[in-house]
Amino acid sequence: KKKTKIIGLTGGQGTGKSTISNILKIILKEAYGLETVIFSIDDFYKTLNERKIMSKKISNLFLTRGAPGTHDTKMLYRCIKNLKKKKFKKFMIPKFDKSIDDRSSKNMWLKIKKKPNIVIFEGWCVGVTAQKKKDLINPINELEKVKDNKKIWRQMVNLEIKKKYKKIFNL
């Protein structure tokens, strides 16, 4: 069997990542008979409770989901590894419910029953790379200037990208 191909799709909020992913899925199935799984990095946000703990321990900015560091990178890494395994086993991909700002119950998760040919992994920060230390010196906006004047949040986000996200994006 051929290896599962991973396509990383990045773009800003509302730019059509999900729409183009679904169109690609239809084309790949109808024209080539390929099974495609689509999921978003958004579905891997840490739980509200996990982010509350981070906001108390590290920076209150981690309470708001979105930035690198607010995703469950261990779960995401395992998910991509599972999708690529030669000896495929059924598993589930989490779903995040933005209306409750928390992970959905497991009965809402995406059930993956067979090895896909293609995986489309989409999100606004998919493929992002860490910044150089010199680029972290000055705040880039009012939020960082006021709420992160010691640069704790920004440095932690960058460290997460450098260590955990890079490992995922290199799969």
Identify the function of each model-found stretch:
Residues 1-8, 12:
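Extreme N-terminal, non-catalytic leader segments
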Residues 17:
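Conserved lysine of the Walker
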Residues 20, 24:
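Hydrophobic positions on the alpha1 helix immediately C-terminal to the Walker A/P-loop
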Residues 26-27, 55-57, 135-139:
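Glycine-rich, phosphate-binding/catalytic loops in enzymes
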Residues 26-37:
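Post-Walker A helix-loop "phosphate-sensing" segment adjacent to the P-loop in P-loop NTPases
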Residues 37-40, 44-101:
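Conserved nucleotide-sensing/catalytic segment adjacent to the nucleotide-binding pocket
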Residues 103-171:
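ATP-dependent NMP and nucleoside kinases share a basic, alpha-helical "lid"
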